[in-house]
Amino acid sequence: MVKRRRAVLVTPAVDRRKADLAMRSTADEIVLDLEDGVAPERKDEARSLARELVSEYGHSRRIAIRINGENTRWADDDMGMCASVSSALDSVVLPKVESPEVIVRVADRCGTQIQALVETARGIREINRICTAGPALISLIIGYADLGADLGRPALPHGRDWHPIQDAVLVAGRSENVEVIDGPHLTIADDAGFRKAKEWTDLLGFDGTWVIHPGQLDSAREIYTPSPDEMDGARRVIDALDLGHERGQGAISLDGKMVDEALVVAARRILDKGDE
């Protein structure tokens, strides 16, 4: 059974207290950050702590590590550390991905699968090619802060303002069976804004979201988990078409609506999202 990334909590690897709290949270996955959340002079300290945390928690908790970019001076040490704990590490988050080749290289170095942060204009332009990286790539995440800076627009996501980019990433991911995760809402004390942004990407079809504070976890899990009524409706659609097939029909009426294979595909996706 696949465990969904509905609510992914990102925490700086340099702060042991926050990391321990994250490990005990309700997040579906913890991302230990070695990149933007860590000052240059503390990269070695963060890398050492990340190794400890993965060794301690990784066999019972799904953990990913966001490393520094392949062309930075910290990348070799980051990748070496990830390789040393790869048996307990779920995946590596790679920033500013702009090609499938970098995904394959880093996956080989780290001995793990890769989650790709798409956060540059070139990354968006190359998104379809990025998704041809094969089994090394398991998810895409939109990084609004860096992408906004690269595009010259505000970093805060405002629903439809990002719609073309969100759809481009979603279509590319779906075409290669890659999870698509929304980037974090950057204002912490703003549950209404958080919910508005995340309900929008849930409506678009995203699988989940990054969060930057434990207080956002419950809302994220609720938004990206189908309700009991939605789950029941999906089961009824599947059962109705199964009955139609038994009768030799390609489509059947349910509650005054025609049910065919297209609706069953959507129903199965709802059941998959709600299946823990």
At which residue positions do the language-model features occur?
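Expand to "…catalyze enediolate/carbanion chemistry for C-C bond making/breaking, isomerization
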Residues: 1-276
